[in-house]
């Protein structure tokens, strides 16, 4: 697929131009709205997911913003979880609030609370299928049933599990948002986000295609679309290795916790807890298998003694990169409390269950023995 860096497009006739600009014919007229390279990526994702429409944006946050802008307006509210990505929380509670849109953050595991929170002014139900970094799994079918009973869409951020490995549509999701910066890009070479629309609410296509793309101006660049089209070609193979590495790593780290306790190692040099939804003793494991199959993603967390221990651990890593991205080909580590949730108060972090003892690991394609050894040496180096 060639990369069309063209900003504008020449037409054969005045009528052709008028038809394109007025939406009577879907054809590229200006690359803020349509671009052949970006459309190729959109069409590929559409074929992979069975979606009615796919829209590619310049980042994951742009995709989230545009999906919510379809439904959010003054006097409306968005019902969502206490557990959300930090920038999504800020978008809802800081940016949208200024325009008269209320956010109601509740425990989505309490289905009665979800029903009670939705009223005649609710625009949508929004969630992450697996929360970051809490690793809480949403019951998509149950929440979709509630949303549809109330006549509102279920919008789900599905970035944590690729759409090639589970069907959000079959679980009742109306609109998926995906940070294509993550698994799809793979090598952290491009930013992007996708809105995947399953057609249950026709207003999505109408507003994004003919309003938001024109007026907001956050369409994906052709270069990013080209890079991510290449990433899609290897997504399945990469994800299988990353998910298997994550499961193997989680199991070995659990064994390390037990061995360290049996050997009475110094408390500061211990992994206190391992959280991964692929582990059979994880409280969300059964639901995760039901929804996502046998693969459980490439994100896990470990808990250490305190923040000082976490910083020491990160500083002593030799193979794993200190970076904020997720689902890169390379393994990454971050301290969420002080970084992606850094701007929030201690009280807000407590409400979101973000602890200063937690390290988030994104497991890459390296040899799993090397990843494990790097974690162990960094833990044992904690003073």
Residue ranges of model-derived segments:
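PLP-dependent enzyme catalytic core of the Aspartate aminotransferase-like
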Residues: 93, 102, 116, 308, ...
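Conserved N-terminal alpha-helix of the aminotransferase class I/II PLP-enzyme fold
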Residues: 8-65, 87-96
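Glycine-rich beta-alpha junction loops
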Residues: 7-12, 182, 234, 278-282, ...
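Short, well-ordered beta-strand elements within core beta-sheets of diverse protein domains
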Residues: 227-237, 297-305, 360-364
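Positively charged, small/polar-rich N-terminal and surface patches that mediate targeting and assembly
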Residues: 1, 36, 327-329, 333-336
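Conserved small-domain helix->loop->beta segment predominantly found in fold-type I
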Residues: 247-330, 344-352
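Conserved PLP-enzyme active-site core in the AAT-like
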Residues: 53-275
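Short conserved active-site loop signatures built around small residues
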Residues: 1-4, 195
């Amino acid at each position: 697929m060639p990369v069309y860096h063209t900003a504008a497009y020449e037409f054969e006739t005045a009528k052709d131009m008028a038809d394109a600009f007025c939406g009577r014919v879907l054809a590229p007229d200006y690359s803020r709205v349509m671009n052949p390279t970006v459309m190729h990526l959109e069409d590929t994702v559409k074929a992979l997911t069975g979606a009615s429409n796919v829209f590619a944006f310049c980042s994951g946050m742009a995709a989230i913003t545009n999906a919510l802008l379809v439904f959010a307006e003054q006097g409306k509210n968005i019902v969502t979880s206490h557990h959300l990505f930090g920038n999504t929380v800020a978008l809802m509670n800081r940016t949208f609030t200024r325009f008269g849109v209320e956010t109601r953050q509740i425990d989505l595991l309490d289905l009665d609370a979800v029903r009670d929170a939705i009223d005649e002014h609710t625009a949508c139900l929004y969630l992450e299928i697996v929360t970051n970094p809490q690793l809480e799994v949403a019951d998509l079918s149950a929440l979709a049933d509630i949303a549809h009973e109330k006549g509102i869409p279920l919008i789900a951020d599905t970035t944590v599990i690729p759409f090639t490995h589970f069907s959000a549509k079959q679980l009742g999701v109306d609109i998926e948002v995906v940070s294509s910066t993550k698994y799809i890009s793979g090598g952290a070479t491009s930013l992007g986000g996708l809105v995947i629309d399953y057609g249950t609410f026709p207003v999505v296509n109408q507003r994004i295609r003919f309003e938001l793309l024109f007026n907001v101006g956050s369409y994906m660049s052709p270069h990013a679309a080209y890079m991510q089209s290449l990433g899609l070609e290897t997504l399945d193979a990469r994800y299988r290795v990353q998910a298997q590495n994550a499961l193997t790593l989680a199991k070995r780290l659990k064994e390390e916790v037990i061995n360290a306790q049996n050997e009475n190692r110094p408390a500061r040099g211990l992994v206190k807890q391992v959280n991964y939804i692929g582990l059979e003793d994880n409280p969300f494991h059964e639901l995760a298998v039901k929804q996502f199959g046998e693969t459980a993603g490439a994100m896990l967390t470990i808990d250490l003694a305190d923040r000082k221990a976490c910083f020491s651990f990160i500083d002593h890593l030799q193979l794993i990169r200190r970076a904020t991205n997720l689902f890169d080909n390379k393994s990454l580590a971050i301290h969420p409390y002080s970084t992606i949730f850094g701007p929030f108060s201690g009280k807000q972090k407590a409400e979101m269950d973000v602890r200063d003892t937690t390290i988030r690991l994104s497991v890459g394609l390296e040899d799993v023995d090397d990843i494990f050894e790097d974690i162990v040496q960094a833990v044992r180096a904690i003073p």
